[in-house]
């Protein structure tokens, strides 16, 4: 097959370092009967070792040339290829117990992480390579510089662990940033949950739109309806100081007051 040229519009950086590939596969620890979905298989760096360990693998690939290569390289009983933009794919189609993996395109990483939350109740775990700075934001704690909307939203749904860094030279072409690998395990149904996920997202987004301001100012006219003492949040707190459980209580208080709708 002819050499594939990486396409900027798809954010393509192909993983080539065998030691990194091996470390990722060991972190995933696939079992023969696992239902694994790989996003962005590219030139099969992860696909090949995964297929060697699985009965069957599903992949989502936006690049039609790469999708055609995959179909030519692997028989359909080994590999199912969904040729589509991952942001448009309904991941619920893959069923309960799925494990999602991939070297995610850095230009759509945050929207894709939010998109995948819609199938989190069916997911066993997720292993992704992303920009290190994105993973640092994902796992950040309150009162840290990296803590923000992404931290709160993902931590409300997953237990996350940064596994290891990956240098630019592990890719072709090399990205301009250091990458890292993260493990995401969905929290169970007994996790703290807001009365409305949509309202929770709206409150968190509004709070972090002015992260340096005191929360009562950042929330605008909503602030007057918040029982600050009851929810355990000082009215002088900034969004970057408020934990996930506190944001959930804040959301439920605003819903109860009729300030926002479910």
From Swiss-Prot:
Residues making up the signal peptide according to the UniProt record: none
Q: Name the Gene3D superfamilies on file.
A: Ribosomal RNA adenine dimethylase-like, domain 2, Vaccinia Virus protein VP39
Quote the catalytic activity from the record. adenosine(1518)/adenosine(1519) in 16S rRNA + 4 S-adenosyl-L-methionine = N(6)-dimethyladenosine(1518)/N(6)-dimethyladenosine(1519) in 16S rRNA + 4 S-adenosyl-L-homocysteine + 4 H(+)
Q: What is its main location?
A: cytoplasm
Q: What are the recorded GO MF terms, alphabetically?
A: 16S rRNA (adenine(1518)-N(6)/adenine(1519)-N(6))-dimethyltransferase activity; RNA binding
List residues binding S-adenosyl-L-methionine.
Answer: 13, 15, 40, 61, 85, 103
Pfam name, any one? RrnaAD
Could you identify this protein by its name?
Ribosomal RNA small subunit methyltransferase A
Species source reads Bordetella avium (strain 197N)
